[in-house]
């Protein structure tokens, strides 16, 4: 509630990404919540534009961590796809001091998304003894950054040697960009391998598929959010996939935001939903490869939309798929699915899964 109040008061916050919802169960409450949430995101983007200037709007998404502080005048942006960390400020006084503080806190922040309120400018980032970015960033001497002393020295080096500035027409924007190590994606993935293996054994879902979904959904960003209010590493939506999984486990209601921001809980829930798609919603598809293509596409756009590509009758759709080769099923889903995002999604996840199978 506190986060939504902050959203409403400051006209509010960040989040941007896929608008696709996991699952096909569209209920009125979910639609109202999502529409209201989307309106607040639009208002927040407008407010950031007023503060930072035209074409300077940066908001959090599945693969982008964005945290504003200093009355929204300083921001930290981690692009987990590109592997860059950009710290910027439009503070009119002592901009270097604002940047230095933000650099240190970003480098040393922990990996508990529920402790950071992305919906306000509150400086609630705590320095951790186990920084989330440890090993994903090295300082100017090539050393990983764990302690405040090393982070402070690196911040001083960056401000002296890499400080940039540009004008947005009204203000000067000061910035520092840090490149992550080349294998930053693998470094993040490694953090969650134990959780992935546990979920894989529990639900009978291939580890490579879980990892491929995580890479495609969030680039292993535990802070991942979206305009459809999908949360965490596997971008689970509380009121659809989350509710389906809870119901299958004999639980009432929906998983909380803090539950889905917990990496282990998120991976467990996302994997449970993959198992439901495979064993229940799409269980009538006989060929395991064809069924895997259908499951991947359904994780993005829903099982119903997958089956309707082949027939409006679900049983007939499965029968039609069972007469096709896996290659033809893949070709059909990547060319005839009504959602361009879902068509691309199957290609991305399938490609990523191949890379994890080779390891």
Swiss-Prot record:
HAMAP family according to UniProt: MltC (MF_01616)
A GO biological process held by the record: cell wall organization
Reaction(s) the record says it catalyses: Exolytic cleavage of the (1->4)-beta-glycosidic linkage between N-acetylmuramic acid (MurNAc) and N-acetylglucosamine (GlcNAc) residues in peptidoglycan, from either the reducing or the non-reducing ends of the peptidoglycan chains, with concomitant formation of a 1,6-anhydrobond in the MurNAc residue
Record has Zinc as a keyword: no
Record membrane topology: Lipid-anchor
Keyword terms, alphabetized: Cell outer membrane, Cell wall biogenesis/degradation, Lipoprotein, Lyase, Membrane, Palmitate, Signal
CC per GO annotation: cell outer membrane
Designated name of the protein: Membrane-bound lytic murein transglycosylase C
